[in-house]
From Swiss-Prot:
Protein's name according to its UniProt entry: Large ribosomal subunit protein bL21
Domain of life: Bacteria
Gene responsible for this protein: rplU
Role according to the record: This protein binds to 23S rRNA in the presence of protein L20.
Subunit annotation: Part of the 50S ribosomal subunit. Contacts protein L20.
InterPro entries: bL21-like, bL21-like_sf, Ribosomal_bL21
Entry keyword Ribosomal protein: yes
Record keywords, A-Z: Ribonucleoprotein, Ribosomal protein, RNA-binding, rRNA-binding
A molecular-function term among this protein's GO annotations: rRNA binding
Sequence similarity: Belongs to the bacterial ribosomal protein bL21 family.
């Protein structure tokens, strides 16, 4: 089974056991997270398409830690003034391991892990 989730303004195709890097979340390593905005789900026989999201459907994950992305450098140069400025940036990401995909039921976690 796989699903397409939206978090941090980006979309990710995930299945159980995947490790993904998402925009920085304010959580500690080892914390459980739920992604509620599931846009698409496929379990091999049944396809669910959200409009825009699938109601009562969640993707569960566990925070592994925070990582930094690749360094992006920029350069600004003004030849007539003999002026040059160089700077760089490394974006912080949260690494999440997907632990389950399933529906959410009242009072229960749903079929978490299946």
């Amino acid at each position: 089974m796989y699903a397409i989730i939206k978090t941090g303004g980006k979309q990710y195709r995930v299945q159980e056991g995947d490790i993904i890097d998402v925009e920085l979340l304010n959580t500690d390593p080892g914390a459980q997270v739920e992604f509620g905005e599931v846009l698409f789900a496929f379990d091999g026989a049944k396809t669910q398409i959200g409009k825009p999201g699938i109601p009562n459907f969640l993707v569960y994950g566990e925070v592994v830690g925070t990582v930094k992305g690749e360094k992006v450098t920029s350069l600004k140069y003004k030849p007539s003034h003999n002026q040059c400025r160089k700077w760089g940036h490394r974006q912080h990401y949260t690494r999440v391991k997907i632990t389950g995909i399933g529906s959410k039921r009242k009072g229960k976690e749903g079929n978490h892990g299946s």
